[in-house]
């Protein structure tokens, strides 16, 4: 890793040095049964316990020597750089919240500027703003009178503790993602300001392989770095094939890149298989956890540079098993460890609770949810060192340790 680079991730398993998390906040308390579909949740976590579980996750990482950063803290620090940046951030946040009334926009600008510090303001933006919190705003316009039933003027962002999805570190750059839904796409504004204005990243060599103003969707849970030369991307419920091509073109043709191939995995379109990292993750040099439903013949496309046409790509279908595809591109024998031991019922249950969604701290050393005890026992028997974290509430959001973390720096293998 070069000294002038703030990011470095060239594998899924290199020793983790720096990671970005978001501690669940009041946005979780603003979930109601009527809002679950709109805000992409299946259940309502108990915030007190969810925070305790998340704190245990963060402490596990720290004890393993990982520097833990928080999204909300970096975002607040990024807009400290100047009042102009802060006002631009507030204005953009309000626009992306879907606020149409000019008077309401003015009231929100005044409200956000009333906070004594930027961290409190960012926390409130993430938590959502209820109408009654704008005490001096008089709802007299047609817009306000017609829309007087819905409780929020700015929706809460309960998915924020899944920091993997809004952006993804690849090599020394990032994909600043355009998420599938408006609900989640709003989350990417924080990363935008962090990477443009935070002193940790401003002026550093941080190329954007994909940007949030694209029209097609890409989410970080579909991006897995198999090696310094091979990136896997899922074509899924949340990521479009067109986005994979855009990412591949930018990444493969960048002058200073080690990546040579992008593997596009077409995975089932369902809630259980939402992202590629919900169906397989790497736990060691030669070992992957995997849902049994994806080990058969797969539709995978190997994307490389066209040697005859400038800035063009070649996509070749690789119709084979997951094991053989990984063996071919990683140039080693591969062992797939089935979630739930391959038992149909156990696999379905533990897959629902992200049994295949592990976070590697180092080769052969991973963080897992306690509730997936069958898969965990199998991993231990395979020689994998486990850091087991409590998960009764965090798992209600349908994401595991990998989903809840965005590595910024890993050691190269």
Swiss-Prot record:
Its EC number is 3.5.3.6. Pathway: Amino-acid degradation; L-arginine degradation via ADI pathway; carbamoyl phosphate from L-arginine: step 1/2. It comes from the Bacteria. One of its GO terms (molecular function) is arginine deiminase activity. It is an enzyme of class 3 (hydrolase). One of its GO terms (biological process) is arginine deiminase pathway. The active site is at residue 403. Its main location: cytoplasm. It catalyses: L-arginine + H2O = L-citrulline + NH4(+). Signal peptide: none annotated. Keywords: Arginine metabolism, Cytoplasm, Hydrolase. It is found in: Cytoplasm. The keyword Repressor does not apply. One of its GO terms (cellular component) is cytoplasm. Pfam families: ADI (PF02274). The keyword Transferase does not apply. Belongs to the arginine deiminase family. This is Arginine deiminase. It comes from Clostridium perfringens (strain SM101 / Type A). The lineage of its organism: Bacteria, Bacillati, Bacillota, Clostridia, Eubacteriales.
């Amino acid at each position: 890793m070069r000294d002038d680079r703030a990011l470095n991730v060239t594998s899924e398993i290199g020793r983790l040095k720096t990671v970005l998390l978001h501690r669940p906040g009041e946005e979780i308390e603003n979930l109601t049964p009527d809002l679950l579909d709109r805000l992409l949740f299946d259940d309502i976590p108990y915030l007190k316990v969810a925070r305790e579980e998340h704190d245990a996750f963060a402490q596990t990482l720290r004890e393993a020597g990982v520097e833990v950063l928080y999204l909300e803290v970096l975002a607040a620090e990024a807009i400290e750089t100047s009042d102009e940046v802060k006002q631009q951030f507030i204005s953009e946040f309000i626009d992306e919240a879907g606020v149409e009334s000019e008077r309401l926009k003015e009231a929100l600008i005044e409200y956000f500027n009333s906070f004594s510090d930027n961290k409190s303001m960012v926390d409130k933006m993430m938590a959502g703003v209820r109408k009654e919190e704008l005490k001096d705003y008089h709802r007299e316009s047609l817009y306000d009178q017609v829309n007087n039933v819905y409780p929020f003027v700015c929706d809460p962002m309960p998915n924020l503790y899944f920091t993997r999805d809004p952006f993804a570190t690849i090599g020394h750059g990032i994909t600043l993602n355009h998420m599938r839904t408006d609900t989640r796409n709003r989350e990417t504004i924080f990363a935008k300001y962090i990477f443009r204005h935070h002193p940790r990243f401003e002026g550093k060599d941080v190329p954007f392989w994909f940007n949030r103003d694209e029209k097609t969707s890409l989410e970080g849970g579909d991006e897995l770095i198999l090696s310094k030369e091979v990136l896997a991307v899922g074509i899924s419920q949340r990521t479009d094939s067109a986005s994979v091509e855009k990412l591949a073109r930018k990444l493969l043709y960048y002058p200073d890149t080690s990546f040579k191939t992008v593997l596009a995995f077409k995975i089932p379109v369902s809630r259980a298989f939402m992202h590629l990292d919900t169906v397989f993750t790497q736990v060691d040099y030669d070992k992957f956890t995997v849902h049994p439903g994806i080990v058969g013949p797969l539709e995978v496309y190997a994307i490389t540079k066209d040697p005859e046409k400038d800035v063009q790509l070649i996509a070749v279908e690789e119709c084979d098993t997951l094991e053989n595809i990984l063996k071919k591109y990683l140039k080693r024998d591969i062992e797939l460890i089935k979630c739930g031991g391959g038992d149909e019922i156990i696999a379905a249950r533990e897959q629902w609770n992200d049994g295949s969604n592990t976070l590697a701290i180092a080769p052969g050393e991973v963080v897992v949810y306690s509730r997936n005890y069958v898969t965990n026992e199998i991993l231990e028997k395979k020689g994998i060192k486990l850091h087991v974290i409590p998960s009764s509430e965090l798992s209600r959001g349908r994401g595991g340790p990998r989903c809840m973390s965005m590595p910024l720096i890993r050691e190269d293998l």
